[in-house]
Amino acid sequence: MPIRTFIFDFDGTILDTESQDFVVVDEMWKAHDQVLELTEWRTGLGTTGGFNAYDALEARLGRSIDRAHWKAHNHQRLLEHCSTQPIRPGVHALFDYAIAHGITLTVGSSGNREWVHRWLHEHGIFHLFATIVTSNDVSAVKPSPEIFLTVAANVAAHPADCLVFEDSAHGVTAANRAGMRSVAVPIPSLVDAWMPDSALRLRTLADITPAELVARAAAAPLPSATA
């Protein structure tokens, strides 16, 4: 069955904001003479309600920190770091391929609307997407399939015709539960992390041509939806 819709996760897939988040949170922990383990931090990627850097730091210290100060400080630092990040390798080529082949481009993100829209506008790609679904639009984020199923409904696409691009285990799980094929492309800090089964797992989206990627993904077995 041909792929008719691309669904891109945002954080970590289109733009590597997640590595920058670790840098900023790690700075806060070091300021309190604590070590943040990468394996602990990455449990919260691609979802909400997972690892909370503030709760974990306070538990480690056995006391409260000035959260208002640190949240404002960290937000500004994150904006500074993210503003220097390019679109991840291979993403623009997939956009071009989709446009040339009549494939609908969409975004399905567990991030909030303001955050996702900000960076899509910043990089001049907001207009490419037929629909952008964020945490503001659903009752449950990934690993629930609701975000991806909402994307499909918004563009009248069947899940079997969709290909999801994800960097996190929560995102790939959500795609599988939605009955959609997926391409896993972890950020560098997740390359050794466990991932659910996906149609493809790549180091970057530039590892193979868009045509080969689509052909290989389309030939992969379709996950059984469990929504």
Regions found by a protein language model. Give the residues of each.
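Conserved phosphate-coupling serine/threonine residues in phosphotransfer and NTP-handling enzymes
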Residues: 13, 109-111
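Surface-exposed, interaction-prone regions with an acidic/low-complexity signature
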Residues: 11-12, 101-104, 123, 132
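Residue-level detector of anion-binding/catalytic polar loops
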Residues: 35, 104, 181
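N-terminal helical cap/lid subdomain that shapes the substrate entry/recognition surface
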Residues: 2-93, 99-101
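Residue-level marker of regulatory loop/turn positions in helix-turn-helix DNA-binding domains and
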Residues: 87, 108, 140
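Short, flexible loop segments at the rims of nucleotide/cofactor-binding pockets, characterized by
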Residues: 82-86, 110, 178-179
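Asp-based, Mg2+/Mn2+-dependent phosphohydrolase catalytic module
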Residues: 1-4, 96, 112-113, 117-227
